[in-house]
A protein has these predicted regions:
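Short helix-initiation/N-cap motifs at beta->coil->alpha
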Residues: 72-80, 206-216
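N-terminal export signals
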Residues: 1, 5-23
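Ligand-binding pocket segment of bilobal, Venus flytrap-like solute-binding proteins
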Residues: 181, 211-232
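Proline-aspartate-enriched helix->loop->beta-strand connector
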Residues: 87-93, 224-225
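Extracytoplasmic substrate-binding proteins
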Residues: 28, 109-175, 202, 266, ...
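A short, structured surface patch at a secondary-structure boundary
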Residues: 28, 34-86
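Alpha-helical, coiled-coil/dimerization segments enriched in small aliphatic residues
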Residues: 55, 185-210
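Structured C-terminal subdomain patch of bacterial secreted/periplasmic proteins
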Residues: 27, 128, 222, 226-291
């Protein structure tokens, strides 16, 4: 695939790379990991069910979830009766759900794929998962196209942002007006930073999922850092922050270097990584245009 061809796969955000085969009987897949589900959709395969449609519509957003996909409830307490009614051929799970694996195996064979591990490297895990899923559903060429398109897109964003990449950036999600999750080592966002040539302002250790939960005062360590925060904000947080002396003393507040990002699935795979690169690049170029 040429670089131009790979980039073309992202002209329309998250357009499906493939259409399901009209001849082969598709596997009936229940997918309990949104990162795996978004990858399947990009391969042109719709699972019969996921867990938590409301979570998808709030945080994952893209690719859109087809309305016919069922919702089996929460991750840790899926509706086993509904699962049985769906008659899946396979259930895709993640290590986080190993505690309920025996229950799931009463319904269908379970395949566990871990995008997030103690070792980190979620980008490499996403690449491996893309190939594993593509092999499972007979979409090997589409899987390689998705990998090539993702790498090519990041190269293009890196070129676009090169003149604007000098200052580091904090990426946070607000837990409440005083505390945030800040994303760093082992996170999907860090992997994207590395590939598009940006510096992360948060260099301290993080947990299994690639974030630290800190008070907002801990964001004052870098005098020239920018802040990118992910929507949605907790109810009432915006008004409380504007009245907070601690918040108003932050260097990025005084320098007016704050960027609002639409929701991105921070625990996703290649589609989430691409969405993050796209919305962050838009915010950075918009900030530069405003001067």
């Amino acid at each position: 695939m040429t670089r131009r061809g790979a980039l073309g796969l992202f002209v329309l955000p998250f357009a499906a790379i493939a259409s399901p085969s009209a001849t082969a009987k598709p596997l009936r897949i229940v997918c309990l990991d949104d990162g795996l589900a978004e990858t399947l959709l990009m391969l042109g395969v719709s699972p019969v069910a996921i867990a938590g449609r409301d979570i998808w519509e709030t945080w994952v957003v893209e690719p859109p979830l087809p309305p016919e996909i069922a919702d089996v409830g929460t991750l840790l307490e899926p509706n086993l009766e509904l699962l049985q009614q769906l008659r899946p051929d396979i259930i895709l799970s993640m290590p986080y759900l190993d505690g309920i694996k025996p229950l799931l195996e009463r319904v269908a064979p379970v395949t566990t794929i871990g995008l997030y591990t103690e070792a980190g490297q979620p980008y490499q895990r996403a690449l491996e998962a893309t190939r594993q899923l593509a092999g499972l559903v007979g979409k090997e060429s589409e899987g390689e196209a998705l990998i090539a398109a993702t790498d090519a897109y990041f190269s293009e964003v890196r070129r676009q942002l090169a003149p604007l990449s000098a200052r580091p950036i904090y990426v946070v999600s607000f837990m409440d007006p005083r505390n945030v999750r800040v994303y760093g080592k082992k996170s999907l966002f860090q992997e994207v930073f590395d590939r598009i040539g940006l510096a992360n302002a948060w260099t301290a250790e993080t947990n299994y999922w690639g974030f630290s939960t800190i008070g907002i005062d801990a964001l004052a360590t870098s005098s020239d850092a920018r802040l990118a925060y992910l929507e949605p904000l907790p109810e009432g947080a915006g008004g409380t922050l504007t009245e907070s002396p601690v918040w108003n003393a932050m260097p990025f507040v005084r320098n007016r270097s704050i960027m609002r990002l639409p929701a991105v699935h921070m625990f996703g795979a290649f589609p989430s990584a691409t969405r993050f690169a796209r919305v962050l690049a838009s915010a950075i170029t918009g900030e530069a245009a405003r001067g």
